[in-house]
Amino acid sequence: MGDWNLLGGILEEVHSHSTIVGKIWLTILFIFRMLVLRVAAEDVWDDEQSAFACNTRQPGCNNICYDDAFPISLIRFWVLQIIFVSSPSLVYMGHALYRLRAFEKDRQRKKSHLRAQMENPDLDLEEQQRIDRELRRLEEQKRIHKVPLKGCLLRTYVLHILTRSVLEVGFMIGQYILYGFQMHPLYKCTQPPCPNAVDCFVSRPTEKTIFMLFMHSIAAISLLLNILEIFHLGIRKIMRTLYKKSSSEGIEDETGPPFHLKKYSVAQQCMICSSLPERISPLQANNQQQVIRVNVPKSKTMWQIPQPRQLEVDPSNGKKDWSEKDQHSGQLHVHSPCPWAGSAGNQHLGQQSDHSSFGLQNTMSQSWLGTTTAPRNCPSFAVGTWEQSQDPEPSGEPLTDLHSHCRDSEGSMRESGVWIDRSRPGSRKASFLSRLLSEKRHLHSDSGSSGSRNSSCLDFPHWENSPSPLPSVTGHRTSMVRQAALPIMELSQELFHSGCFLFPFFLPGVCMYVCVDREADGGGDYLWRDKIIHSIHSVKFNS
């Protein structure tokens, strides 16, 4: 029946350029079709015509009845089926060889270009390593001797699968129409020149029926493999697309990790820069580096001090607060306009609107800084925090909350508060506080005549409920700050009518207080003058 070596050699070449399902299909084609057909089926159909006998002596009747019973021999039918079903694979193999040749030329061109780059003495080590990896990859591709299944080659592969599937279905239908699923031993022939109906007998009908069912089963399995291969290619393409998408998202996550995943062990910091603060509200920081921007107009000086708590901006006149997060630096930049801008009443953060502004018991444990309002021509000021003591031992003296009230240009009362660190030597002067207390009676009558009062400028919570002291810059911890409620309330009421704004400025290793007094001249205007207590750097306020 001819030699199958040529067809087998070509199909073996196709085997190297197929998918795993395609290789299974080729294995079934080789073993269960070509081998079975050559070794066993030929002998079964060898005496097909000679053993076909009819009960008539009419010349030509046997030939006519045999031709009617077997329009085409099943052996030749199966050979044609193998050739036609394999022909799309041969076409694909031709295209694959063409692409392989073009791929080899491109590989040689790339290899020559990379070798030319290697001869350049100005290449750095990283570039040389990259070129070496590329050369090794090209050599590996040469050993594989295979073209990547993508692009037009992939389309050709899918097309050849569809074509052989259609041919497989066609041959299965043809075999069923010609012979069905069973070979009958008796065939009645009514073709002329046979007289009437002639009985003809088929040799080895049972054996032929078995081979017929076997070939039908192999054809059905081949068709199922073709369908599975199409699904395999589609699923693989979808998975490749999803993998590329997930890889790109992974790269984006690595290049830009979220802010909440960044952890820092450095001390918290506070920076003061230029903008107009409106309202300052507290936040709680957990071992993260934070930057707070509080604006001082006409000044480019920036102080950087430890910040135990985080500040954010929340406008008191209904404006929308905003903040900027820098994910790469791990800092929070808070832009705050002037805390005195607007004429609305002062409010303390962490309290409801119906709460008293002077009740320290109503303040939240996380709140440590309040807000104040004033005329828009007021001088801007910067609010800092105290630097924690470098001494890890507790000082035993609490911080004192001082409140002072004064009048603005409209006659409304203003209140300011500050924490005085008694543990620091020289943090305040006794003479200055004595003067403030002595002037209480003089300003008390003026403050009592005011019709409208605003909430505290700087309001601090109960530090007796503070969870734990925050670490200083040197890594030490300060002691728990305990508040003496009665002395604080007394001093707050004393400074409530003192008419002085006392503002703290803290630099690393320096504790500085600035007192701003407003004095009325004969015309009713207020003059600003500043006093610096225990100061190293001078601070100016521009009215």
UniProtKB/Swiss-Prot annotation:
It is found in: Cell membrane; Cell junction, Gap junction. Belongs to the connexin family. Alpha-type (group II) subfamily. Its main location: membrane. Residues 1-16, 98-165, 231-543 are cytoplasmic. The chain crosses the membrane at residues 17-37, 77-97, 166-186, 210-230. It is a multi-pass membrane protein. This is Gap junction alpha-10 protein. One of its GO terms (cellular component) is plasma membrane. The keyword Nucleotidyltransferase does not apply. Residues 306-359, 379-424 are annotated as: Disordered. InterPro entries: Connexin, Connexin_CCC, Connexin_CS, Connexin_N, Connexin_N_sf. It comes from Homo sapiens (Human). The gene is GJA10.
